[in-house]
């Protein structure tokens, strides 16, 4: 039984969050399909840059795990 992983890495000024299993369940966040996003360190994040099937699930991960506010696309930070 393989573990579910959420990888957070910093590369070339961008944060990449990769959900690497067909479905991911994080405690308190529910489950959602796999996908990946690249969050720019500066500028804004457009909805069409998000390649995750369940965007609500993604926003929960961004907010709860990463400390990224859904309505504040101007800044990204790790809590």
UniProtKB/Swiss-Prot annotation:
GO terms for biological process: defense response to fungus; defense response to Gram-negative bacterium; defense response to Gram-positive bacterium; killing of cells of another organism. Residues 1-56 form a propeptide. It comes from the Eukaryota. Coiled coil: none annotated. The keyword Transcription does not apply. Keywords: Antibiotic, Antimicrobial, Fungicide. The keyword tRNA processing does not apply. Has antifungal activity against C.albicans. Has antibacterial activity against the Gram-positive bacterium S.aureus and the Gram-negative bacterium E.coli. Lacks hemolytic activity against rabbit erythrocytes. This is Ixosin. It comes from Ixodes sinensis (Hard tick).
């Amino acid at each position: 039984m393989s573990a579910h992983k959420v990888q957070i890495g910093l590369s070339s000024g961008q944060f990449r969050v990769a959900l690497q299993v067909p479905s991911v369940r994080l405690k308190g966040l529910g489950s959602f399909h796999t996908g990946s996003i690249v969050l720019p360190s500066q500028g804004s994040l457009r909805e069409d840059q998000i390649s995750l099937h369940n965007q609500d699930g993604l926003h929960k991960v961004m907010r709860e795990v990463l400390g990224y506010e859904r309505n504040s696309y101007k800044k990204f930070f790790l809590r």
